[in-house]
Amino acid sequence: MLFFGFLLAFLSAVPGTEGEIIPRCELVKILREHGFEGFEGTTIADWICLVQHESDYNTEAYNNNGPSRDYGIFQINSKYWCNDGKTSGAVDGCHISCSELMTNDLEDDIKCAKKIARDAHGLTPWYGWKNHCEGRDLSSYVKGC
């Protein structure tokens, strides 16, 4: 019985791998408050579509692409934008540790995502957006919010 108590205490102390799933309309509100509507010619619907297809609204989303990795709700890449200490030749364009992009505090994620969009003049760096959102009617992503 003591073993199970120890195991339960240990598992409670280990951070979850699922992260916080931010409800769609809550994220719409956050992005509006941070000036995403019209930013670099994008709409809130573009960003919501991007997030759905990149991370499914999960703040701790992680994707290993082999030579680099994607982190957080916007799936920001370690080759160009953040430092994970593992990616050879990383640029660290946002001057941030990739682990900071996997918290429930979205401030750093938002700053970096806006820098990426500003540098690219849009959302083309994100394959989730290019493959699922670009040129489509995205009104359903903000409907009811």
Swiss-Prot record:
CC annotations in GO: extracellular region
Single Gene Ontology MF annotation: lysozyme activity
Stretches of the chain forming a coiled coil according to its record: none
Active site (UniProt): 54, 70
Outcome (variant: residue 23 to S): In 50% of the molecules
EC number: 3.2.1.17
UniProt-listed SMART domains: LYZ1
InterPro entries named among the record's database cross-references: Glyco_hydro_22 (IPR001916), Glyco_hydro_22_CS (IPR019799), Glyco_hydro_22_lys (IPR000974), Lysozyme-like_dom_sf (IPR023346)
Function of the protein: Lysozymes have primarily a bacteriolytic function; those in tissues and body fluids are associated with the monocyte-macrophage system and enhance the activity of immunoagents.
The protein's name in its UniProt record: Lysozyme C
Organism: Opisthocomus hoazin
Lineage: Eukaryota, Metazoa, Chordata, Craniata, Vertebrata
